[in-house]
Amino acid sequence: MKRRVLTALCAVMLVFALCGCDIFTADTAELLSPPELSGDISPIADAIAKSAGGQYTLKYPSNGNYRSAVVQNDIDGDGILEAFAFYSMKESDGDAANMYINVVVRRESEWASAATQKIVAGGVERIDFCDLDGDGISEILVGWEIYGASERQLAVYSFKNGELTQRTMQKYSRFVCCDLDEDGTNEIFIIKFSAAEQINSASVYKLTEGGVTELYSCELDKTVQSVAEPVVSHLSSGKPAVYIDEIKGVGAVTEVLFVEKNQLVNPLMNPESQETLLTLRSAGIGARDINNDGIIEIPVQENVPSLTKSAVNEKLYLTNWCSYNGETLTNQMTAMINSNDGYYYVLSPKWTGQIAVLKDTENHIREIYRYDGETASAADMLVSFVTVKLNDKDVQKYLNEGFTEITRDEISVYLCKIGETAAAQGINTDTVKQNFKLTE
């Protein structure tokens, strides 16, 4: 996390160093009159200016893989790129600005505007391209921000024979393209949620000659307050599935949706309470392929005895990373996560149910102890971890006390000390280094 903040700050400083303030309008987008896009994209900018006929403000997508206001993509596979521009214009003084999508194509040696569509919107949330009807030509999916980020509308456009046709327009919170029913054709997976109304759902839509029709839908956890980007992957059984990390009032959960017997199902949710509790955990930890086996694992919390001495009776947890086959969560590995210092440690399976943890946030220490559940007492220390600032004099102090450096980054040094019992079990510095991971 610390590395991300530094990188982001450097990027912002670099942007301001490379460009003058006069290129920004009041809404921080680029006002082009005439266009100032340079290099290979300059002829496209000329075509946009000619088509627009006046001042316009380029609109950059706030999310997704495509972050440019002018996106080039070969949607029909003929080896020639098409360009898709997104901008706003005021039709006359005092009027609200309208948003445009402008398709610019190369005709012989020149670029020219082929088609435009106008919409009342404030910005672009994301852009995607996906062949939704199996004809070999990708549709253009545009998530429009209607009133800021509070309301979004997904528009699906087809561009064929020089014409841009809008196929659908509907509300969404998140969307992604995927082939969940394995029929060989991509569908649109749309999430809609309303924290205020507690009405959350997911639907799968198919593009036909008559437009976009709903194939399947199901309910999501009704108490969800925010939804992360859905991840298209597979169950451990190989069936296509969508993994959705969500924030609830009491933490985070993951819901996994897939098509079963011609229905979109969400087996991890309790249908009676309309809540998902099986994957409940602290916020900030999302599903991922934690062990690089090609299958997404879901983090599930497990209580662990705490040896922390504090006025607050803080509960401590280990994290079980579980694969899911559509019926059962199966633990693949267990880790002690230290989000404050930015690392996690994969625990030996031998320690399952036999350890306690000491958490000393002030001194950046985590220690694992052997624990007797019957007597509820801790025995000897197995492994101790400490995080020290890179140039801190305490680094040498800990080295003198028998600690060994595991790794370091641009900010901190991470050290460990292995107890006699752990050493007798075959745990050594190399073992610790192998199982110690910095969080991204």
List where the protein language model places each region:
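Sec-dependent N-terminal signal peptides of Gram-positive bacterial secreted proteins and lipoproteins
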Residues: K2-A26
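Generic N-terminal leader/processing signal
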Residues: M1-K2, V104
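Short, exposed beta-strand-loop hairpins at the edges of beta-sheets
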Residues: A422-G426
